[in-house]
Amino acid sequence: SAGETLRRLWKNHHYTWGVLTQMFYVAAQIMVWTFIIQYADNLGIDKATAQLYNIVAMGLALTFRFLGTYIMKYLNPHTMLTVFGIGAALCTTGAILWVGMGGLICLVAISAFMSIMFPTIYGIALENVHERDTSLGAAFLVMAIVGGALMPPLQGMIIDQKVLFGMPAVNISFILPLICFIIVAAYGRTAARISRRKQINH
């Protein structure tokens, strides 16, 4: 029954953390792509040019999605998620601390690392889910998109402060996506450890 499936999924911590990680990833993606415009505007870049940076970011995500699929032939998905999560976190740190064009370039570069996250988290979360539970399990992973919409308004509120701690508030606001990417990297690392433990036990 659906109730029994829900109980099994709830007890599967690898899966439940996967759903939460997916939620944080989606939140990060929305925040990065939504607020590139405000970040560029703070540097005195007009909105039309700022939109071009957004388009470049999305193009990077698409390009690296294909590259990531190729690289995954040589690296397992857990390692890929960890490495790309760390890469995204480092770029986000650059976007926070570097006030200027360098920060904007870091912000655009985040999209390259986001490219493989959604399908990779999805696949990893379902690794230890029984076949009879996968339909409902997959549905919750897709529904995590809704949860991801909760954080961007908070980032918008931070940006509205204009200046925080002597820095542009738009830079400080990217601490929220930074937290999300750290969670993504940590999930990849934890999943890798679980996978290795299972291989040793077998």
Where are these regions (language model features)?
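Loop-to-transmembrane helix entry
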Residues: 44-60, 136-139, 169-172
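Helix-to-loop junctions at the C-terminal end of transmembrane segments
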Residues: 64-77, 159-160
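Structural signature of the two symmetry-related core transmembrane helices
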Residues: 79-94
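A membrane-interface helix-boundary motif in multi-pass transporters
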Residues: 154-180
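Multi-pass alpha-helical transporter architecture, strongest
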Residues: 175-202
